[in-house]
Amino acid sequence: MSTIGTGYDLSASQFSPDGRVFQIDYASKAVEKSGTVIGIRGKDAVVLAVEKIITSKLYEPDAGGRIFTIEKNIGMAVAGLVADGNFVADIARQEAANYRQQFEQAIPLKHLCHRVAGYVHAYTLYSAVRPFGLSIILASWDEVEGPQLYKIEPSGSSFGYFACASGKAKQLAKTEMEKLKMDMRTDELVESAGEIIYKVHDELKDKDFRFEMGLVGRVTGGLHLINPSELTEKARKAGDAANKDEDSDNETH
């Protein structure tokens, strides 16, 4: 712990002399240690992809999932602490259910993002609680609004994106996503997500990982699907092929 944080990092309600809230900085560090999570908007779909690090071969395959279905057309992926992710996913589902009960329709993603971001921000204001060690990516698609993608940071700030990333390889993933077209078809979207996750995975530090994917769009009938078998396998094959091509290029040079 740096000396500048001494005495100013015990509470989320206290600023340091240089205007920082160290508890939020520490929450961001928890996100940076997590496996990489990305979201990409296409022409008529949004894909969420996760590099789920396997810390033990004794876990069941679906243990510690980082992708959630919030509403039938809304998906959520998280980087950071899995337990925090489960908690916030339940909060988001409750917000969606309350909206549907009151207005008899699905909650707009922008409204859900605003509500969840406000909840996350509230946990940065009081000394009795700690900020969530979590970065949240929300995705949806419908006939009226089309594809939508938002990200919420541990501070509670939120923005809309064409593509975004969180986790340990965030910067490398962003560099790869900046090369993409912004109006990709669903099959291109899925393959690009697989290629990026496999490319940013660091085999020296984290040997085993499981690729997981969430997809919502016209091809899914407006439903958010987690690990749709055919498309997920397509993404994994594209990622594996891209990884092998990169390895062969490195050997050549």
From Swiss-Prot:
One of its GO terms (biological process) is proteasome-mediated ubiquitin-dependent protein catabolic process. SUPFAM superfamilies: N-terminal nucleophile aminohydrolases (Ntn hydrolases) (SSF56235). Residues 231-253 have a biased composition (Basic and acidic residues). Its main location: cytoplasm. The keyword Transmembrane does not apply. It is found in: Cytoplasm; Nucleus. Keywords: Cytoplasm, Nucleus, Phosphoprotein, Proteasome. SMART domains: Proteasome_A_N (SM00948). Coiled coil: none annotated. The modification Phosphoserine is found at residue 248. CDD domains: proteasome_alpha_type_3. It comes from the Eukaryota. Residues 230-253 are annotated as: Disordered. One of its GO terms (cellular component) is proteasome complex. The proteasome is a multicatalytic proteinase complex which is characterized by its ability to cleave peptides with Arg, Phe, Tyr, Leu, and Glu adjacent to the leaving group at neutral or slightly basic pH. The proteasome has an ATP-dependent proteolytic activity. Belongs to the peptidase T1A family. PANTHER family: PROTEASOME SUBUNIT ALPHA/BETA (PTHR11599). The 26S proteasome consists of a 20S proteasome core and two 19S regulatory subunits. The 20S proteasome core is composed of 28 subunits that are arranged in four stacked rings, resulting in a barrel-shaped structure. The two end rings are each formed by seven alpha subunits, and the two central rings are each formed by seven beta subunits. The catalytic chamber with the active sites is on the inside of the barrel. Interacts with ntc. This is Proteasome subunit alpha type-3. The gene is Prosalpha7.
